[in-house]
Amino acid sequence: MKAIITVVGKDKSGIVAGVSGKIAELGLNIDDISQTVLDEYFTMMAVVSSDEKQDFTYLRNEFEAFGQTLNVKINIQSAAIFEAMYNI
């Protein structure tokens, strides 16, 4: 399983640490990561994977709830969606 995680919110310390900790807690591996601050806003994109089958509804709910604790918006989408878009 491969997925794309995006994080957007007002910049503050601890966002990368918190999100990467949650990724590890959910049994996902970070394959690639990029983050930047645009004006006062933090943005991050990570490619994550797992050898095990993952329930995307569960992951989506977990990241949504966790994002609220950091006051950021966290999204997770299957990488297969992006691969299908470019293989038409």
Curated annotation (Swiss-Prot):
Q: Which PROSITE patterns match?
A: ACT (PS51671)
Source organism, top-level taxon: Bacteria
One Pfam family, short name please?
ACT_6
Concerning InterPro entries, the annotation shows: ACT-like_dom_sf, ACT_dom, UPF0237/GcvR_regulator, UPF0237_ACT
Residue span, ACT domain: 4-77
Q: Which CDD domains match?
A: ACT_1ZPV
Q: Its quaternary structure?
A: Homodimer.
Family designation: Belongs to the UPF0237 family.
Question: What's the protein name?
Answer: UPF0237 protein SP_0238
The opening ranks of the lineage are: Bacteria, Bacillati, Bacillota, Bacilli, Lactobacillales
